[in-house]
Amino acid sequence: PFNPSTKIDIQTVERNYLKVQIVDVAGRLVNTLVDNELDAGYHVVRWNGLDVSGQSMPSGMYFIQVQSGDRMNTQKIILLK
């Protein structure tokens, strides 16, 4: 669980397009944190618990979706206020 923010550690082995999104349990997009090419290496992405319009999200379960090329990785996170 996290409050008020969480970090996502990402390591890439080569320069690649990366998309990191937060979605709710219904699969609706909450926020896009990264949507561009990143150099190879270690990257830290933070989510502050806000949606795309800057509104604070309620406590609950969310999913971090990390897409790199044709790969998609999803991880569950819990926001507690």
Predicted regions and their residues:
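C-terminal outer-membrane/trafficking sorting elements
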Residues: 2-81
